[in-house]
Regions:
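N-proximal helix/coil linker or "cap" segments that precede and/or mark the start of modular domains
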Residues: 11-34
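Short loop/turn microsegments at loop-to-beta-strand junctions
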Residues: 28, 53, 137-139
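Structural microenvironment flanking redox-active thiols in thiol-disulfide oxidoreductases
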Residues: 68-107, 119-121
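Short active-site neighborhood of thiol/selenol oxidoreductases, capturing the structured segment around
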Residues: 45-72
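Bacterial N-terminal signal peptides that target proteins for export
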Residues: 1-6
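A short beta-strand-turn-helix
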Residues: 31-53
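Structural micro-motif
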Residues: 109-111, 128-141
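Thiol-/selenol-based redox modules, centered on thioredoxin-like
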Residues: 135-176
Length: 176
């Protein structure tokens, strides 16, 4: 029994630690329908990178408990990201109507969330959940203004995504 439990734990940890885009690799450019404060617009990663680093965080589904908690944490920390010249966007496979509401409620109208119903962006960033590929994994990337991956963090637990991405932006900022 103990051996099976240890094996399952190691397998789970291996799955949660996977991300195909390595630090220093070019992030895939994308544009997508997004919502900020209930207003729908076209988000462009290239445009956002002209202003500074971008945190692109993927989440499984709007209004699920962990995703709502994570959005709340990012909303509470958005002023800290902005103070360092960084912006944040969440991405999921939810439709834009759902994300439009989510952008007001969970995101508190403080940052946009993008719809990737066809999962093109999720696939390009290797952000599919290994055990449920119809959902995005909880995966956060920090992308430098030159389009290179500075940092990534994978964990289904939403608790450390904000803290870790803030730390990565702060570390990048100190080199500038």
């Amino acid at each position: 029994m103990l051996r099976a439990l240890c094996g399952a734990t190691i397998f789970t940890l291996a799955l949660s630690a996977h991300a195909a885009l390595d630090i220093g690799e070019a992030a895939p450019d994308f544009s997508a329908q997004a919502a900020l404060g209930g207003k729908v617009y076209r988000f462009s990663l290239a445009e956002s990178l002209r202003k500074g680093p971008v945190v692109v965080y993927f989440f499984p589904a709007a209004y699920s408990e962990g995703c709502s908690v994570e959005a709340h944490y990012f909303a509470e920390a958005i002023a800290q990201f902005e103070a360092m010249g960084a912006s944040v966007i969440g991405v999921s496979g939810d439709d834009i109507a759902t994300l439009s509401k989510f952008s007001v409620q969970a995101c508190q109208s403080k940052f946009p969330v993008a719809s990737d119903e066809g999962q093109a962006v999720i696939g390009a960033f290797d952000a599919r959940m290994p055990t449920r590929p119809e959902y995005a994994n909880r995966l956060s990337y920090v992308i430098a203004p030159d389009g290179k991956i500075l940092y990534y963090y994978v964990s289904l637990n939403p608790g450390k995504h904000v803290e870790n991405t803030l730390g990565a932006v702060r570390a990048w900022r100190q080199t500038k």
